[in-house]
Amino acid sequence: MENISALHAVKEELTYLNQMFPLSEFVDHFDTFADGSFPSHWHNEFELQIMLKGNAEYRVNGTRYMVSEGSAIYIAPEAVHMMKALSSNAIGYNVVLLPQFLTNLFQVSNCEKYAAPLTSRHPEAFVITPERKEGHAV
């Protein structure tokens, strides 16, 4: 797996079907990527990828995360990241959302503190597993 460098990472520009709801979602079939990996990139959105099948290794700002089937990874806005399948036929469901959308939504309902963990750049990433009982502190 390559060493992540912000100098070599490409900014991924995502498009939205509806500008009022800036969300993109797609299914990643890792076998369709060269060598089963998606190269270093970053974007303004935060990302949540759920492993539907198989296992994958993620590198986020140089830190390694292992994500297994049934688990997910949260990646903060502007974090440089890449992913590589660790098993054949690995599939992930991916959702990316502009943090400003959540900030605006929660401001309207006076719940800004709930948006803070998803709109900040720290933590850069964390893995969510079915066994994990605790939530993220607000």
What is the role of each PLM region?
Residues 2-24, 80-138:
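A hydrophobic/aromatic-rich effector-binding and dimerization subdomain
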